[in-house]
Amino acid sequence: MTVLHLADETEAADLAAFLSRLLHYDRSAAVRLQATGTALAVFGRPASFEVLAVRAVRLSEPYRGDPDTTLDVTVSAGELLESVDESAATAAVPAAVTGPPWAGVLPPRGGWRTEPGLPPAGALGATVAAAVAEFRSRTQELAQEHRTRAELDRIGREIWSRLVGETQLPVRAVHAAQSLRFLRPPAVVGEGDSARPPAASGEEDLALLSSGTWLRLRTPYGSIAVRRAEAGLGSLDVSVR
C-alpha cells in the first residue's frame, strides 16, 4: 500500500479535519487525489452544495520519492481518514474505487484570472448568515400541508442560487466554504485545524477566480469551484482526466 508522507503533524490533522467534514455530509463520500512533487490536491463534493471542494496538502517528500511520478486516484474518504496517522504525519492511499461522475470532470488546472467584486470575508459570512435565517423563517411560516420536501427544496434553490454582490458566484459556494471551514477568521482555530494556511496552496488571500465556465472561491485554507450559472452542456470547459 502506498504511503504519503505529509509535511508535519499539523498538515495531517488538517487533512483529517477536511475528510471528516466531507463525511459529515455523506458517509460514503469519495475523494480524488492528485499528487505531483510535494503537492497533494484532494478533491471532494460535499453533498447538497453542488460544488467541488479542493484542499491542498503539503508532502514532506515526493510521491514514491520521485518528483516526476504522479498520483491520480479516487478513493473512499472514510478509508483515507482511517489511514491518517497524525503523530507520524502519514496517510496510506486506500484501494481505488469507481468514482462518482463529478470525479471525472474537474476544473481546469490553469488559465485562472481574478474576478472583481468579491466582498470581504466578513461580508461573505454575513451573507450566509442572512440566507440561513431567511430559509428558516420562510420554511417555519409554511402551513403544515405545504411543508413538503419539494417546497423546501424550491425555497432552498431560490436562496442558495442567488449571486454574491456583483459577481457570478452563487451563495451556496460561500456557504460550502464556511461549512468546510475554508472561510474563517485567521485567528479562529477549531479541533483539527491549524491557524497556518497551507503553504503548498499558494493561496495567501481571499479571491474569486475564473477560467472558462468555472469560478473558484480561493481562501487560505482551500478552494470551492463551481460552474457558472449560465454554463450549458454545449460549452463545457473542464479537465476530464
Regions found by a protein language model. Name each.
Residues 17, 21, 82, 137:
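Charged/polar, solvent-exposed surface patches and flexible loops
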Residues 27-29, 54-56, 63-65, 238-241:
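Short, surface-exposed linear patches
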Residues 1-58:
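N-terminal ordered "arm"
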Residues 51-90:
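A broadly used, surface-exposed interaction patch
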Residues 84-241:
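Long, compositionally biased intrinsically disordered terminal regions
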